[in-house]
Amino acid sequence: MSELWTLENIDADGAIREASDAVGDTRMDFFKKAAVGGGTLVAGGALMGGLPALAAATTRKSKKNDTAILKFALTLEYLEAAFYNEAVNGGALSGEVLEAAKIVQAHENTHVKTLKTLVKLKSPTFDFQNTTKDQATFIATAQKLEDTGVKAYSGQAPNILQPTVLAAATSILTVEARHASRFRTLNGANFAPAAFDKPASMKAILKAVKATGFITG
């Protein structure tokens, strides 16, 4: 792990740790406090209510906001890591698809491990609804998840205050873009469909993740 990724270097004055402790170490704490108490469960759904307030909060640069963005990123990385862990271990993949999945699996688990050194947030529980049981369905789902990850990181990069946190986030962003390109190719799609990517807000990303139904608690 590079020096960039140590908590001591990114959080020399303790601001991230202080803000993280204030937010809490569970996914429920994160969404409830970031959304100013708007955390009601979506019926049968993946995430909590009050998400527009959470998204609005991420447009104001501060060290506390950097912590919220890191926790948002960690939630997405938990999802991706769990998805690839299930797919690789499930036995439905083969050939170059399995090879790609193993590479991405290692990356996503490293992202989780690294982000967990920066902020405290427990992993959600997941139900991937058989998307890992069939190779074609897995490829299509992986493409969507990776495209979503790219949009999520690019959408939050302008909202990050601390240069070291920004550097950490953008170094993950470029890897997520490589993942997306690979699964686009495997899915028969254009590996680079445009000269410029359109970022997405946190609100839009959370809505997209909720729509999958993958996060169950």
Which positions does each model-derived feature cover?
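Phosphate-coordinating loops and pocket residues in cytosolic domains that bind phosphorylated ligands
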Residues: 32
